Swiss-Prot record:
HAMAP family (UniProt xref): Ala_tRNA_synth_B (MF_00036_B)
Entry's EC annotation: 6.1.1.7
Disulfide linkage: none
The name this protein goes by in its record: Alanine--tRNA ligase
Domain of life from the UniProt record: Bacteria
Source organism of this protein record: Halorhodospira halophila (strain DSM 244 / SL1) (Ectothiorhodospira halophila (strain DSM 244 / SL1))
Length: 863
C-alpha cells in the first residue's frame, strides 16, 4: 500500500463512521504562543478539548502536518542517523469531543489495523496504563487480544497530560512486531528500545481534569485523542524497517543522489536532505521565513543543516530548492497548498542557500584551521561562537560536524559568550535615569487625538528617577500631568515635543515617554518655578506633530503597498516614525528590485492623491481581525483595540496619531533600502516638505553632473553608459592578461608533476593562502585533467593545506583522507569531501617532508 493510499484509507475509514474530515492546520499554531510549531494531531483541537471552543461536530479525523525542531520537542540532531527521527511528519488521528470513548476508540483502531490494512493480529502488541482496568477488559475480553501480547505500563509511558494542570488521562498503545530477526524486546522490557517492536498508534483517553493540587477530577464529557505516524505505518505496510525506505522519502533521496552523483542511497546526508526539504517547504508554505529569531531561526537552522550535508555529498552549487519539485510529486496532491506556492518556496530556499554558501567554506576553513592547531578533542566555545556570529553556523550544525569527527563541543563556553553579547546589547539599549520606569507616577489621560493644547495639573516631578516637589529655573527633569495632549513614545512613533506653560513659567519638552500609565514629559525649565499641584497649559509643537502624523500615516500605506506588490508574506518587523523621516523593517527574502521600489513608491503616492479620509474606530479584537485589520505578529492586544483605516486600502491596529486625510501627507519618497538581518529588509522614506526638498536637491545634483560631463540632463544616462562600457572593456583586458600570467604559472608548477601507479600527482608549496589557495588548486585540477594535487602555503608559524582529487578518481582516493595524512605531519588536522579538503598545521618545519610523503600515500591507498 502506498503512503497516499494509506492516508486516504485512514480518512475514508473514519469518514464512514461519522467523523468530520478536517484539513491539516498550518504548522504555525493559531493563537497559541505556548507552542513553537504544531507538533501533534490534537493541537488544532486544543481549545475544543479545554471547553473554550465549540465546533459543529463531535467526531473528527485528520492527517495533520507536524514539525518537531526547536523547543521542547526537537528531533533535529538525530535526523539522518536513525530510522524514525524526522523534523516533519504526518500524524493520522481520530478525535471524539464528548461523544464516543474507550470502547469505540479501541474497536476502531483494531478494525482499521487488522481489516483495512490487514496487519496480522499475532504481530500486534497492546499496552494500557497499569490502573486502567476498563481498557484492559475491552482489549482482552471484547477484542480478544492474546494476553501474551498484552502489557500494563506505568504513567511515564501510558498516562498523557496537556500540562501540569488541565485535561489528562491514560493511554493505550499498539505496537507492531517486526519479528525475531530484528533485535529488541517487547514494550515494558529492558530491551524495548530496540527496533523489533515499533509503536504505531497511541490512543489517549482524556477522562480527568488535574487541578493545581494534583487531584484527578473526572471530566463531565470524556474525550478521545489518537495519533498514528503515517511514516511509521507506511514502513510496516511496505515491509521495511527504516522510514527513509518508504515511498515518502525514496523519490527525494533519489533526486538528491542524482544531483550529488552518489550511488549509495544509504548515506546519512541523503536522509538528512530528504527529511529537511519536507520541513522547510511546508514551513515556508505556512508563512515562516528564514530569520534570526523564533520560528524563522529554526527554519534557517534546518536549511543550513541540509546545505552543509549537501556540501558533504560534493554538491558545489545551490541544490536544495531543486527538491521541491519531487516533493510536490509525492505530497502535492494531498496538500495542494504546496503546489500553489511551489515557486515561492523554491525562491526562498534558493536565496537562503545562496546566502549561506557565501560563508560556508570560510567557516569550514576556520574550523579546519582551529582543529589543525588543537588536539584537545573539544571545539572551544569561542570558536563555536565565532562560527555562529560571523559565519552563520547554527550551533547544532557545528555539533553535527563535531560528531562526524568524534569531537565534543564546549557548549558552556559558547553560552558564556552569548551571555556577554546579550548583556552588551542590553547595556547599549538602556535609557538614562530620567527615562527609567517610575513606579508611582500616577495616571495621565491622553487627549492628543482631539487637541494639541490642554490644561492639566502637575501630579509628579522627577529628577534622575527621584520624586521631587519643585523644579527651579535651569533644572532638567520629568513632569507628569493628570491630562496631556502629548503623545508618549510607543509603537515606533516618537514622543511629542512642545512646552508646558503657566504665568511666567516655561518648561521646554524635548521628549515624551511612557511611565506605566503616565506620560512623562522630559525637558528643561527655562523660566519660573514649577511645583506639584500647579495648573499648567500643555502645548504640543504643531510643526513636529504634523510632520510625525504624515510619516505615521505614510507608514501604514507603505505596509499595505509592500504586501500588495511583494506578497502577503511581508510582516512588519520594526518601525520608527519621527518628524523628519520614517523607517520600516519588514520580512522579505531578498532585496526588492529597483522596479519594485518604484512601484511601491508610486502606489503609496497614488493613495495619497486619492485623499482618503483617515478614520479611527474602537472595537473588539476579534471583530477587528474579522474585518481584515492587520495585527502585528507577536504583539499583545487587549480585548478592545483601536483600528486605523485609510480608506479601503489599509486597516491596522494602531494607537498612534495620524493625518486627517491621506492627501495631507503631500508626497512620499523612498530614500534608502537595505538589509538589516537575514530575511529582514529596511526602507527609509520621507514625506511632505522634506520630500519636496529632497527631489529639488536631487535635480540640482543631476544638473551639476550634466555640466561636468558636458551633456544635457536628458543625455546624461547615455553618456554614463558609454563611459561604463569603455571601463568594462579595459577591465576585461586586464583580467585576460592576469589569466594568461596565471596559466603560465600553473604550467610551470605542473612541470613538477609526478606519476605513481598511473595516477599523476603534484605536491608543492605555493605563495599566498586563503581563498587564493583554493582558486589555484581548482585551476591546476582543470589543467591536470586527471590526478591528485596537494598545495601548502606557509604563513608565519602556520601551514595551510588544500588537497584535490579529480572526479574520475574519487571512488579510489579521498581528498579528506589525504589532507589528514599530510596535516598530521605538520601538527594539524582537517577534513572535507572526496574531491576537495583543507587543513591547517602549526609546524612548518616538516612541510617539505609531508609533501614528499604524498607519492607513497597514493601508492598505498589506491583501490
Amino acid at each position: 500500500m502506498t503512503s497516499a493510499q494509506l492516508r486516504a484509507a485512514f480518512l475514508d475509514f473514519f469518514r464512514e463512521r461519522g467523523h468530520e474530515v478536517v484539513p491539516s492546520s498550518p504548522l504555525v499554531p493559531a493563537n497559541d504562543p505556548t507552542l513553537l510549531f504544531t507538533n501533534a494531531g490534537m493541537v488544532p483541537f486544543k481549545e475544543v478539548f479545554l471547553g473554550r471552543e465549540q465546533r459543529g461536530y463531535q467526531r473528527a479525523t485528520s492527517s495533520q502536518r507536524c514539525v518537531r525542531a526547536g523547543g521542547k520537542h526537537n528531533d533535529l540532531e538525530n535526523v539522518g542517523y536513525t530510522a524514525r527521527h524526522h523534523t516533519f511528519f504526518e500524524m493520522l488521528g481520530n478525535f471524539s469531543f464528548g461523544d464516543y470513548f474507550k470502547r469505540d476508540a479501541i474497536r476502531y483502531a483494531w478494525s482499521f489495523l487488522t481489516e483495512v490494512v490487514e496487519l496480522p493480529p499475532e504481530r500486534l502488541w497492546v499496552t494500557v496504563y497499569e490502573d486502567d482496568d476498563e481498557a484492559a477488559q475491552i482489549w482482552l475480553e471484547e477484542i480478544g487480544v492474546d494476553p501474551a501480547r498484552f502489557r500494563r505500563i506505568g504513567a511515564h509511558d501510558n498516562f498523557w497530560s496537556m500540562g501540569d494542570t488541565g485535561p489528562c488521562g491514560p493511554c493505550s498503545e499498539v505496537f507492531y512486531d517486526h519479528g525475531p530477526e530484528v533485535p529488541g524486546g517487547p514494550p515494558g522490557s529492558d530491551e524495548e528500545d530496540g527496533d523489533r517492536y515499533i509503536e504505531v498508534w497511541n490512543l489517549v483517553f482524556m477522562q480527568y481534569d488535574r487541578d493545581a493540587e494534583g487531584n484527578l477530577n473526572p471530566l463531565p464529557s470524556p474525550s478521545i485523542d489518537t495519533g498514528m505516524g503515517l511514516e511509521r505505518l507506511a514502513a510496516v505496510l511496505q515491509g521495511v524497517h527504516d522510514n527513509f525506505e518508504t515511498d515518502l522519502f525514496t523519490p527525494l533521496i533519489d533526486a538528491a543522489g542524482e544531483i550529488a552523483g552518489v550511488s549509495d542511497r544509504r548515506k546519512p546526508s541523503l536522509k538528512v536532505v530528504a527529511d529537511h526539504i519536507r520541513a522547510c517547504s511546508f514551513l515556508i508554505v505556512d508563512g515562516v521565513l528564514p530569520s534570526t529569531e523564533g520560528r524563522g531561526y529554526v527554519l534557517r537552522r534546518i536549511i543550513r543543516r541540509a546545505v552543509r550535508h549537501g556540501y558533504q555529498l560534493g554538491i558545489d552549487e545551490p541544490f536544495f530548492y531543486r527538491l521541491v519539485d519531487p516533493l510536490d510529486a509525492v505530497m502535492g496532491e494531498a496538500f495542494p497548498e504546496l503546489r500553489d506556492r511551489r515557486e515561492f518556496v523554491e525562491k526562498i530556499l534558493f536565496q537562503e542557500e545562496k546566502r549561506f554558501r557565501e560563508t560556508l567554506e570560510d567557516g569550514l576553513a576556520l574550523l579546519d584551521e582551529y582543529l589543525g592547531g588543537n588536539d584537545s578533542g573539544v571545539i572551544d566555545g569561542e570558536v563555536v561562537f565565532k562560527l555562529y556570529d560571523t559565519h552563520g553556523f547554527p550551533v547544532d550544525l557545528t555539533a553535527d560536524i563535531a560528531r562526524e569527527r568524534n569531537l565534543e563541543v564546549d557548549y558552556q563556553g559558547f553560552e558564556a559568550r552569548m551571555a556577554e553579547q546579550r548583556e552588551r546589547a542590553r547595556a547599549a539599549s538602556r535609557f538614562g535615569g530620567a527615562r527609567e520606569e517610575v513606579v508611582d507616577a500616577g495616571e495621565s489621560r491622553f487627549t492628543g487625538y482631539e487637541t494639541l493644547e490642554d490644561v492639566g495639573s502637575v501630579i509628579g516631578l522627577y529628577q534622575d528617577g527621584r520624586s521631587v516637589q519643585r523644579l527651579q529655573p535651569g533644572e532638567e527633569g520629568m513632569v507628569v500631568l493628570d491630562r496631556t495632549p502629548f503623545y508618549a513614545e510607543s509603537g515606533g512613533q516618537v514622543g511629542d515635543r512642545g512646552e508646558i506653560l503657566a504665568n511666567g513659567l516655561r518648561f521646554r519638552v524635548a521628549d515624551t515617554v511612557k511611565q506605566g500609565e503616565a506620560h512623562g514629559h522630559l525637558g528643561r525649565l527655562e523660566s519660573g518655578e514649577l511645583g506639584v499641584g500647579d495648573q499648567v497649559t500643555a502645548r504640543v509643537d504643531r510643526g513636529t506633530r504634523e510632520a510625525t502624523v504624515r510619516n505615521h500615516s505614510a507608514t501604514h500605506l507603505l505596509h499595505a503597498a509592500l504586501r500588495e506588490i511583494l506578497g502577503d508574506h511581508v510582516q512588519q518587523k520594526g518601525s520608527l516614525v519621527a518628524p523628519d523621516r520614517l523607517r520600516f523593517d519588514f520580512s522579505h527574502y531578498e532585496a526588492p528590485s529597483r522596479e519594485d521600489l518604484e512601484r511601491i513608491e508610486a502606489r503609496v503616492n497614488q493613495e495619497i492623491l486619492t485623499n482618503h479620509p483617515v478614520e479611527a474606530a474602537h472595537m473588539a479584537y476579534e471583530e477587528a481581525v474579522q474585518v481584515g485589520a492587520m495585527a502585528l505578529f507577536g504583539e499583545k492586544y487587549g480585548d478592545t483595540v483601536r483600528v486605523i483605516s485609510l480608506g479601503d486600502y489599509s486597516q491596522e491596529l494602531c494607537g498612534g496619531t495620524h493625518a486627517a486625510r491621506t492627501g495631507d501627507i503631500g508626497l512620499f519618497k523612498i530614500i534608502d533600502e537595505t538589509g538589516v538581518a537575514g530575511g529582514v529588509r529596511r526602507i527609509e522614506a520621507i514625506t511632505g516638505e522634506r520630500a519636496i526638498g529632497w527631489v529639488q536637491e536631487a535635480e540640482g545634483r543631476l544638473n551639476r553632473l550634466a555640466d561636468l560631463l558636458r551633456v544635457g540632463p536628458d543625455n546624461l544616462v547615455m553618456k554614463v553608459e558609454q563611459l561604463s562600457e569603455r571601463t568594462r572593456e579595459q577591465e576585461k583586458e586586464i583580467e585576460r592578461l592576469k589569466q594568461k600570467l596565471a596559466t603560465q604559472a600553473g604550467r610551470s608548477l605542473l612541470d613538477d608533476a609526478g606519476e605513481v601507479a598511473g595516477v599523476r600527482f603534484l605536491a608543492t608549496c605555493v605563495e599566498g593562502g586563503g581563498k587564493g589557495l583554493r582558486d589555484t588548486l581548482d585551476q591546476l585540477k582543470n589543467q591536470l585533467g586527471s590526478g591528485v594535487i596537494v598545495l601548502a602555503a606557509v604563513q608565519g608559524e602556520k601551514v595551510q593545506l588544500v588537497a584535490g582529487v579529480t572526479k574520475d578518481l574519487t571512488d579510489r582516493l579521498a581528498a579528506g583522507d589525504l589532507v589528514n595524512h599530510v596535516a598530521a605531519q605538520v601538527g594539524g588536522r582537517g577534513g572535507g569531501r572526496a574531491d576537495f579538503a583543507q587543513a591547517g598545521g602549526k609546524d612548518p618545519s616538516h612541510v617539505n617532508d609531508a609533501l614528499a610523503s604524498v607519492e607513497a600515500w597514493i601508492k598505498d591507498n589506491l583501490t
